[in-house]
Amino acid sequence: DAGLAEHLRPGALFVVGTEAILPQQVVHRLGTRLHAAWACLAGVPRYVLATRDKVYPRELLPHFAVPMLPVTELLRQPPAGLQAEARAFDLTPHSLWTEIFVGGAPAALAVQKGDHRLARGLLQLVP
């Protein structure tokens, strides 16, 4: 991962996908936030490209949680009593990104238009 910083030169772009787009944050695989911060420090433009199903409905925010992986994801045979934070995802503020695109449009426009129809199916799962 540290080698990525050497590619953050003038003229480079940092482009990633996402697991979900929350109102204030973007959800990524662990490590993406650090890489985005490096790109920001290097002055490299940073973009998120997402499909419409990645916009998380506001109504479901109380049910959102960053999943934690079991400690066995870090060690095959962890010592008894070992506690470790094994997050699966990072949360990155929208402000760190040059632009977030959803279905080819800026995220703010996509959200305003309600352009996240696949994610709406999640609402049926909440009592």
Regions found by a protein language model. Give the residues of each.
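Conserved phosphate- and dinucleotide-binding cores of soluble alpha/beta proteins
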Residues: D1-P127
